[in-house]
Amino acid sequence: MINTLPAFWAVIPAAGVGARMAADRPKQYLELAGQTLLEHSLDCFLGHPALAGVVVSIADDDPYWPGLRYASDPRIQRAAGGRERADSVLNALLVLHAQGASDSDWVLVHDAARPNLARSDLDKLLSELADDPVGGLLAVPARDTLKRADGNGRVSATVDRSTIWQAYTPQMFRLGALHRALAECLVSDVVVTDEASAIEWSGQAPRLVEGRSDNIKVTRPEDLEWLRQRWAGRR
């Protein structure tokens, strides 16, 4: 199957601060099993034979990136981090364009603090979307019962979970289409929290590709502790 997978670029926006972690540094630089979350996220892609290259969006005043082992890796280019995720991703796409990437190239955007992406999920995403006219994302069907809250912290309704999915990353779209969608959102002051939202706003419907539920994003301290315990079991 590897020989049939499409070539792709990876983009990792890593300019956020992760305030909910209440840590002494941005969460992408917290340690897991001897290296940072960002390094683990990069590891998910750098050994893949279909990878064309990686762009990481880093804040201009980031003091941590220069000390990482990947900071001088020739496979990785750096883009300026923006105020919002969409700005950071758009800057990375501009770097790809400057490198000669084409509008028809596939781009996979992945969270810097999502270090547990399985190679099987990455290959599944590439395989299932290789000929898709829009692109799509890894996602997981909702498992728990979902409640809608009122303004007073009480349940106002139970949501039908049969149509609800949790959006994960990577999210895979053509470079040109993603660039146009993000640029249009920024010009129109439309706030999007992931790339699929921008594609949706442009009138297209991304495809959902079911992935593993342990491909979690580290958002709170207990997420990192869960990963530490899980990874300790690998030894």
Curated annotation (Swiss-Prot):
Give the first-level EC class, as a single word: transferase
Q: GO biological process: any one?
A: isopentenyl diphosphate biosynthetic process, methylerythritol 4-phosphate pathway
Keyword Protein transport included in the entry's annotation: no
Cite a single Pfam family from the UniProt record.
IspD
Annotated site (Positions MEP for the nucleophilic attack) = R161, K217
**Keyword list, A-Z:** Isoprene biosynthesis, Nucleotidyltransferase, Transferase
Record EC number: 2.7.7.60
Q: Which GO terms describe its molecular function?
A: 2-C-methyl-D-erythritol 4-phosphate cytidylyltransferase activity
Q: Where is this site: Transition state stabilizer?
A: R20, K27
- Catalytic reaction annotation: 2-C-methyl-D-erythritol 4-phosphate + CTP + H(+) = 4-CDP-2-C-methyl-D-erythritol + diphosphate
Involved pathway(s): Isoprenoid biosynthesis; isopentenyl diphosphate biosynthesis via DXP pathway; isopentenyl diphosphate from 1-deoxy-D-xylulose 5-phosphate: step 2/6
Q: Do you know which InterPro entries this protein is assigned to? A: IspD, IspD/TarI, IspD/TarI_cytidylyltransf_bact, ISPD_synthase_CS, Nucleotide-diphossugar_trans
Q: Does the keyword Transferase apply?
A: yes
Function recorded in the entry: Catalyzes the formation of 4-diphosphocytidyl-2-C-methyl-D-erythritol from CTP and 2-C-methyl-D-erythritol 4-phosphate (MEP).
Family label: Belongs to the IspD/TarI cytidylyltransferase family. IspD subfamily.
In Swiss-Prot or TrEMBL terms, this protein is called 2-C-methyl-D-erythritol 4-phosphate cytidylyltransferase
Underlying gene: ispD
